[in-house]
Amino acid sequence: MFESNMVLQTLSSSSPPIHRLYLHHSQILPSSGSPSKISLQIHGRTLAIRSFHDYVFAEISARGLPALNKASLKKLPIKGSTFLLGQSLLMVSAHPQLAAAAEIIKPEPIYEVGELFELSIQLSYLLLLLGLLGVGTFYVIRQVLVRRELDLSAKELQEQVRSGDASATELFELGAVMLRRKFYPAANKFLQQAIQKWDGDDQDLAQVYNALGVSYVREDKLDKGIAQFEMAVKLQPGYVTAWNNLGDAYEKKKELPLALNAFEEVLLFDPNNKVARPRRDALKDRVKLYKGVVAVKSKKR
């Protein structure tokens, strides 16, 4: 069976039919008759194409040339077929319409690669979006659970406080819950009650003073907060969290040398502290600059 994407177009003229090749989505199908003939389907019409031998005999008869028998022509099929194939390829390569049609039928690997690349980008964006949604959902659920836990804890502790059976530790826990819920006045109240009722270890009491100092600083009551932090480090000198909070409060109050001293105290107990080290290094430069400005002003006076 012969299969091809080529269609023959017959051009009428005074000369014998000339067959020109155009690329199209038709097929050359073998005829049901003699094997020397091929039927060609063109736009719903079937055209019989003569074999090479019949075509040569017709040309000789039309031009009045000496007759040749088929036996002598059997020596020429290879040369004739090669010649016709060369002529067909020459016409295909020379005709611009044929070249354009050939370009249409050629596969386009660049287009396919670009399409795959675009699809991969879309999938990447989709996966990224799903990941962000998943992370956001996780944090939202976590916050809801934490808030619910705090609410339950606060409710239970408040019931004990109302009954008058709350211990100093329970008052401290209730004050810490209020601090986390950002109810600072309530946190101050319960933490102060815990300090007054405290009868345990002084080092544990330092945590109560530190929590009360944090509550005051968040209300922008820096002096009261600093006083609580200083009490905490007095009760527990190695309490690095209270030292960091004290340094932060001093820096907010623009007392840079005292803030620098607090962060240096942290590094004495914890040399690799990730909070105190960068703060200390930044404050060193600021303190040097501040001292230089003060020295210049004193000289001018």
From Swiss-Prot:
Keyword set, alphabetical order: Chloroplast, Membrane, Plastid, Repeat, Thylakoid, TPR repeat, Transit peptide, Transmembrane, Transmembrane helix
Protein's name according to its UniProt entry: Tetratricopeptide repeat domain-containing protein PYG7, chloroplastic
Organelle transit peptide residues: 1-61
Summary of subunit composition and partner proteins: Interacts with PSA3.
Mapped TPR repeat ranges: 168-201, 206-239, 240-273
Any one annotated GO CC term: nucleus
GO biological process terms, semicolon-separated: photosystem I assembly
Keyword Ligase: no
Bilayer-crossing regions: 82-102, 121-141
Organism: Arabidopsis thaliana (Mouse-ear cress)
SMART domains to which the protein is assigned, alphabetical: TPR
Chief localisation class: plastid
Source species, domain of life: Eukaryota
Induction: Induced by light.
Membrane-topology annotation of the record: Multi-pass membrane protein
Lineage: Eukaryota, Viridiplantae, Streptophyta, Embryophyta, Tracheophyta
Effect of loss of the gene: Seedling lethality when homozygous. Dwarf and pale yellowish phenotype when grown on MS medium supplemented with 2% sucrose.
Gene: PYG7
Role according to the record: Nuclear genome-encoded factor required for the accumulation of photosystem I (PSI). Functions as a PSI biogenesis factor. Cooperates with PSA3 to promote the stable assembly of PSI in the thylakoid membrane. May target primarily the PsaC subunit.
Pfam families, sorted: TPR_1, TPR_8
InterPro entries attached to this UniProt entry: TPR-like_helical_dom_sf (IPR011990), TPR_rpt (IPR019734)
Compartment(s): Plastid, Chloroplast thylakoid membrane
